[in-house]
Amino acid sequence: MNKSTIKALYFDLDHTLWDFEKNSALAFKTLFKQYEIGLKLDEFLKVYVPNNTAYWRLFREGKIDKEKLRYERLKTVFDRLNYQASDLLIYDLADAYIQTLPEYNTLFPGAISILETLKSHYALHMITNGFKDVQHFKMKNSGLLPYFETITDSSSVGKKKPDPEIFNYALKVGGVRPSEAVMIGDSLEADVEGALNVGMHAIHFMPVVRRNPTHYKEIEQLEELTFFL
């Protein structure tokens, strides 16, 4: 990758700039008190976090819709923990979670400072598989919104990363060719491989070090983007 030819950077949001797991835990902490959920939060999260990842994969692959994602990711966790939760409670909790989540705005360390540095040299864009209304509030409340020229979300395009269509759409609205753009995200499949498949460059953000490193460009901290850009 020759950085002199790069004009635009495309970021993922959740797990890349916006610390999803930390903010999600804070949201559930609030909701467990509000709804008087009789479970220890850490025990719930131990099951919920990988379960949520699995359900998001199904959603990304088009095997379930948004409503099933929101309901099933909670229902299955309560079932595994043998906690009696009515459908009414689960639906109410699912809706409240979506409303509460954007109220917490923890970003990964260095997020704002690296965006400040990069915006002087590149056009910054966002590509996200998250729900449009929720993602907008996350970006607004966390101070990320002013840094990005365009935001491409899967609900507006009708395709989710790693589908080539969402990348090509984002490149078109950003006014750049694939060879002039870099995708930065935490998902090897959705962000890195999806971008590479349309001719973009890609950098894999992995704040949790993996035992088996890949052959892709990788960073563990956002500030390390300056090594490549």
Tell where the protein language model's regions lie, with residue ranges.
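Asp-based, Mg2+/Mn2+-dependent phosphohydrolase catalytic module
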Residues: M1-L9, K22, L88, I112, ...
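N-terminal helical cap/lid subdomain that shapes the substrate entry/recognition surface
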Residues: K3-L13, L17-P109
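Residue-level marker of alpha-helix boundaries and capping positions
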Residues: D65, N105, M126, V182-M183
